[in-house]
Structures are given as C-alpha cells and as structure tokens.
Amino acid sequence: MAAGNWTRLSEFILMSFTSLPTEIQLLLFLVFLIIYLVTLMGNSLIILVTLADPMLHSPMYFFLRNLSFLEIGLNLVIVPKMLRTLLSQDTTISFLGCATQMYFSFFFGVAECFLLATMAYDRYVAICSPLHYPVLMNQRTCTKLVAASWFPGFPVATVQTTWLFSFPFCATNKVNHFFCDSPPVLRLVCADTARFEIYAIVGTILVVMIPCLLILSSYTRIAAAILKIPSAKGKHKAFSTCSSHLLVVSLFYISLSLTYFRSKSSNSPENKKLLSLSYTIVTPMLNSIIYSLRNNEVKNALSRTFHKALALRICIL
C-alpha cells in the first residue's frame, strides 16, 4: 500500500454494539452493570474473607485470592469503558488508551491461564501426597508459584502490544469490537503482518496449551488417586476439594477456545463479540459464585466473618 494511505491515528472508535437500537443498548448497560458489580463484590469478598479468616490461610486460598485479583483486574480494564459506551454513546478511545487496554487484557488473561495450572498442581499435591503437602506447598513455594504464574503475562503483553501498535494504520480507525483486542485492531494495519500473525498464533497456542496440558496431567493423576480410595465417602471428599476448580477451568478454556481457535468462516465479528463477553465478563462473575456457593469452607468463613462483624457492631453501639 502506498505511503500516502498511511495515517497516524490519535484515537480509535469502538463499534461494539452501535448497530443495536438505543433501547437494547440501555438494556445491555443494565445487564452488564449488574454482572460487573456482582463480579467486583464477589471477588473482593473472597479476597477479604480469605485474608481475614485464619481457617483459610492455606495454599488453596492463597491461589484463589490471586485468581480473584486477576478477575477484578480484567474487568476493570474492559467493562467500565464498555458501560460508558453503552450509556453515553461515547465510542472513542485514545491511541494510548487502546494500547493500554490491550496490554492489560493480555497480561491478566495470560496470568490467569498459568495460575489455573498452578491451582491444579496444588490440588494434585493435596490429593496424591497429603502427608507431604504442608512441606511441599509451604509459603515460600506458593509465592514462587504465583510469581511464575504472573510473570509470562509481562513479556507476552509487552511484545504483542508494542509490535502491533508500531505498525502504520489505514485511514479508518473503527475497531469492530467492544474493547481493543488484537484481531480487530490488526485489521486496520496497512503493512505486511505475516510475521506478527505467525507469532500471535504460536504464542496463543503455547500460552493456552502449556497450562492446559499441565492441568490435564494433574487431573489425570488426581483421578487415578481418587479411584484407588476404597470408600465412596473418601472419594466424594477428595473430588469435592477440586470440583470448583475443575468447573472454573472448564468455563474458562471452553470460552477462550471458542473465541480464538475457531475458523474465520465460522467466527464472524458478531459471534466473536458474544464469545468474548463470556470469558471477559460472564466467567469472572461465575467464578466468584462457584467458589462462594460450592465451597463449604468459604461459606462457613463468610458466616463467621459476618457474625464477628455483627457482634463488633453491637459492642460499639
């Protein structure tokens, strides 16, 4: 393409749901606002309760706190701008704002992939080596595992975002999405992006497949260990300790795979928007609900924390 067709953009326009009637957009605003608030409150509550209750000062809940923090971070990066767009029809986002949104969406997404694998390893050690669990999963080891889970997000987000935004863009600045994701922004580039696309595909496969294989390996060994337990009660107790995590992993990877690994012919921009909503907005809300309602220890901790707060308030009055 001739250099005269290149342009230096100062802002982008997020098309998101602009094709829908105003009434539908207002309805979506209310729905997404409720989901957003439930996500923030649910995950914040998990963080506070697991910090406040001594009974939850274990590796499993240390990892859960980090997962809740990542879910909050991903929502804060994407949802507020989407809500403002739906309510005020302000669809513009600055060049720097778009790059920042893309960077942190990559960072939190990649970190979550590896953290879910770390949580699977934690369940594997707890079920397959219960006597050695306190030694193997001490505070220092857990801190290292969390750091190792967060770290891949930095190079992936830095390389992919800086590389993409170093390309020249065409005259159009309309991003056909509700946030600055890589594929819709890449369509605006006026340059040969073959090398970048190869890097993006290989990077996405590695980021998704490496944690996925670690999770499958952990749960294969967990299943084998559970089948060796003689009593049905023992099997149920062992499975219940990892059922919440298994459900969260399934929701995350199914929605992520449907979004990024479907063929272009079967994955229209509108379908991709709906699928992106599932892993960026709906799944973080469901995660907090799953870990709150399906986990007896968290429910009991919530009850204890509530009664302590109520008793303290009564004493003050």
Q: PLM features: residue spans?
A:
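Transmembrane helical core of 7TM receptor-like proteins
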Residues: 1-317
